[in-house]
Amino acid sequence: MEKIVNLKEIRKGGSLSFEYKGQKAILIRTKKGDLLGYIAVCPHEGGDIEWDEQINMILCECHLSLFNVQDGSVYRHSSLFELNQGLTKIDLEVDKNNDIYLAQKSR
């Protein structure tokens, strides 16, 4: 298994970029401590996404689309286009040493 990071290396409210199957990905640790992983590409036009800790949302700066952090669903998008598809979630596992890995079914 390929370790992504140890839990102590990512603060609550922080995020970390990593590569997943040749694509940009993001690991988010919410202020509550939840660990969430997503392909870091907006489903609209492939723009980069970023975690915005202040608003507790994932943001695509290209058209200011917002995605729910808990499930990657579309929260808000521009009225200029239709966006029905949310972000692709990546399942994660944490071992007894607090190392974070891709879950078996994500590999």
What are these regions (language model features)?
Residues N56-L64, V74-L83:
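Short cysteine/histidine-rich metal-coordination sites, predominantly Zn2+-binding motifs
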Residues E45-G47, H63-L66:
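Active-site glycine-rich loops that stabilize anionic/oxyanionic intermediates
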Residues M1-Q54, S73, G86-R107:
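N-terminal pre-ligand scaffold of iron-sulfur
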Residues S15-E19, L66, L80:
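Intrinsic disorder/low-structure terminal segments
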